[in-house]
Amino acid sequence: MPIVKAKPTSAGRRFVVQVTSLELYKGRPHPALTKKLSKSGGRNNQGRITVRHCGGGHKRLYRIIDFRRDKIDVLGRVKRIEYDPNRSAHIALINYSDGEKRYIIAPKAVKVGDIITSGREAPIRDGNCLPLRNIPVGTLVHCIELKPGKGAQIARSAGSSCQLVAREGDHAMLRLRSGEIRKVPLECRATIGEVGNDGHGLRSLGKAGAMRWRGKRPTVRGVAMNPVDHPHGGGEGRTSGGRHPVSPWGVPTKGYKTRRNKRTGKFIVRRRKK
């Protein structure tokens, strides 16, 4: 996965760093596995902004991803690896032996032409999906379920994975990238290997416009606003805000705890590193 630094032919190209993927398919996605994706601009059904800094961006089609991997004991061949604008990971189009096609999150070691499958007796090979009960301790896995049959929820972004460190009773112990060790039921399924496109974090967009293409709008500092718009606003000349940093609605930020004390640590063996 070569890293390419753009030639500084203009101010907008000077700081661009791209991670090129030569194996990516250049055509359009499979039509039967896409659907319309409408934009909200961060507004709710009353037209009010509920999520700031959203809006614009290039049109997208949503790719329907198979997170359940419920084609049990059916062999599938990787037809192509594709770019997906809706996530950091790449996706793989799978041709199953019964004629069905599905998209999955593309594992790092899987390439075009490889054979993958799901099931309790599936080989321990990158891209295969098995219950945690049947996966050897020490294996790196991704796309992990939290409830059996619900579909993958953990370790789905580019380059991510978890390590199966132990089994205890009806649960497996998984070490997440954050350092957290978490219990997951043994009947939950996971895919062997790491998620591909692990160079995603090395890229540099190079200019503000590239962020606008992704549908993200600018973030304005409170001290640059008027008093009517933000608690830090106003004042003659440049000011520091004059108080502890707060949100536009007066809630303290930078370390202030806002989460309700109702969470349970029943399935968390060790908290993530701070």
From Swiss-Prot:
Answer whether the UniProt record assigns the keyword rRNA-binding to this protein: yes
GO CC field: large ribosomal subunit
State whether keyword Ribosomal protein applies.
Answer: yes
Q: Where is this region: Disordered?
A: 222-257
Q: Name one GO molecular function term.
A: transferase activity
- The disulfide bridges present are none
- Keywords from the named record: Ribonucleoprotein, Ribosomal protein, RNA-binding, rRNA-binding
Domain of life here?
Bacteria
Q: Output the InterPro entries linked to this UniProt entry.
A: NA-bd_OB-fold, Rib_uL2_dom2, Ribosomal_uL2, Ribosomal_uL2_bac/org-type, Ribosomal_uL2_C, Ribosomal_uL2_CS, Ribosomal_uL2_dom3, Ribosomal_uL2_RNA-bd_dom
Query: Which biological processes are named by the entry's GO terms?
Result: cytoplasmic translation
What is this protein for, i.e. what is its function? One of the primary rRNA binding proteins. Required for association of the 30S and 50S subunits to form the 70S ribosome, for tRNA binding and peptide bond formation. It has been suggested to have peptidyltransferase activity; this is somewhat controversial. Makes several contacts with the 16S rRNA in the 70S ribosome.
The UniProt similarity line reads: Belongs to the universal ribosomal protein uL2 family.
Quaternary state and interactors? Part of the 50S ribosomal subunit. Forms a bridge to the 30S subunit in the 70S ribosome.
Q: What protein is this chain from?
A: Large ribosomal subunit protein uL2
- Higher taxonomy: Bacteria, Pseudomonadati, Pseudomonadota, Gammaproteobacteria, Chromatiales
Encoding gene per record = rplB
